[in-house]
Structure formats: structure tokens, C-alpha cells
């Protein structure tokens, strides 16, 4: 396990998709996270960066796709996603800069 000093190094980017956007109404946010981070580090990072109370963290490792190029085959990088659920009494995270509905 590697030690990551800054919590902003754990959260790489929010996942922008139709499915993740629909989960925001339920209080679940999806982030691309550092591949070496664990659930505890992700929870602490979200609480420090956004100032909310996290109730659960689910993670998923996604294999990179094999893509054809002019010179043969290449591979996209593997990614790790975290689905973070915040408590109902926490304020919503404004990832996209505005209200959801």
C-alpha cells in the first residue's frame, strides 16, 4: 500500500455519464480514483475535499479496452472507479456546477 499525502491526489476526476448523473439524485457520486487507493483513503479524501459525511464507498477495477491502431493492437489504461454515497443530511456536491434537476 502506498502512502498518498494529499487527498486531491486520490480523486482524479468525476465520471461523467448518463448512469452516474442519474445516481446523483440518490446521493451517490462516481469518481475516477488512483489505482493504489483503498476505500478508507477514498472516504477520507471525499470528506476533506468536499466537506460532506460519507456513508459508504464501493470500488470497481475496470480493465482497459484492447483497441486496434494502424500499427497493430494497443491497450487503454486500466482504471479504478469509486461510487461514494453521502449521508442524507450532507449538502450535495456540485460537481457539474449547478443543480441536478
Curated annotation (Swiss-Prot):
The signal peptide stretch is: none
Quaternary structure annotation from Swiss-Prot or TrEMBL: Part of the 50S ribosomal subunit. Contacts protein L29, and trigger factor when it is bound to the ribosome.
Q: Which domain of life is it from?
A: Bacteria
Any keyword Ribonucleoprotein?
yes
- Is Ribosomal protein tagged as a keyword? yes
Organism equals Nocardia farcinica (strain IFM 10152)
One biological process term from GO is: translation
Which family is this sequence assigned to? Belongs to the universal ribosomal protein uL23 family.
GO MF term (any one): structural constituent of ribosome
Q: What is the purpose of this protein?
A: One of the early assembly proteins it binds 23S rRNA. One of the proteins that surrounds the polypeptide exit tunnel on the outside of the ribosome. Forms the main docking site for trigger factor binding to the ribosome.
Identification of the protein by name: Large ribosomal subunit protein uL23
- Alphabetically ordered keywords of this record: Ribonucleoprotein, Ribosomal protein, RNA-binding, rRNA-binding
* One GO CC term on file: ribosome
